[in-house]
């Protein structure tokens, strides 16, 4: 049975670069913070540039000090581009959004780090399938079928070629 004055849950610190709509990995980190807050958790981002689209309060010195004084140990979530533990978190989660080292970082993580992958093809050895957490970074207000079925065009397809355009698309499609 839950106590009336139960212990305050751990907050989440999301180590996220400044928001850019054009960078899907950055967008996903901001979306993660928003999703945690909408699920009733306390979460913050380290970014200075935020999106008005998401609930992403900044992690400030005042917030850090308040949590320290309350004896709270945050859960720190880093994207795969960050090596080490710059926020000195006791509980560290790595969100593998791309192949480690593809964009930045060398993929050096702590042996106690908890690993989650953005998709199945990014699962590293030892990570089970239940550690896939896919947050689609595209804006469904833009990339969706028209509401009016008469305006839908059969056979039209949209592809994302990836950061470096490495995806081969068969022209016959």
What are the functions of these language-model segments?
Residues 1-75, 167:
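N-terminal pre-catalytic "stem/leader" segment of glycosyltransferase-like enzymes
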Residues 29, 50, 66-169:
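Catalytic core of nucleotide-activated saccharide and alditol-phosphate transferases
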């Amino acid at each position: 049975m839950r106590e009336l004055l139960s212990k305050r849950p751990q907050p989440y610190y999301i180590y996220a670069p400044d928001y850019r709509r054009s960078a899907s990995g950055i967008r996903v980190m901001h979306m993660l913070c928003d999703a945690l807050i909408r699920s009733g958790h306390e979460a913050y981002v380290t970014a200075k540039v935020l999106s008005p689209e998401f609930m992403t309060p900044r992690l400030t010195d005042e917030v850090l000090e308040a949590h320290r004084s309350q004896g709270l140990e945050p859960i720190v979530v880093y994207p795969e581009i960050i090596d080490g533990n710059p926020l000195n978190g006791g509980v560290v989660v790595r969100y593998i959004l791309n192949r480690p080292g593809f964009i930045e970082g060398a993929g050096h993580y702590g042996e106690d780090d908890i690993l989650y992958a953005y998709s199945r093809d990014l699962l590293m050895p030892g990570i089970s399938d239940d550690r896939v957490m896919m947050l689609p970074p595209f804006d469904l207000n833009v990339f969706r079928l028209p509401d009016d079925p008469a305006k839908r065009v059969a056979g039209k397809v949209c592809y994302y070629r990836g950061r470096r355009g490495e995806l081969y698309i068969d022209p016959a499609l």
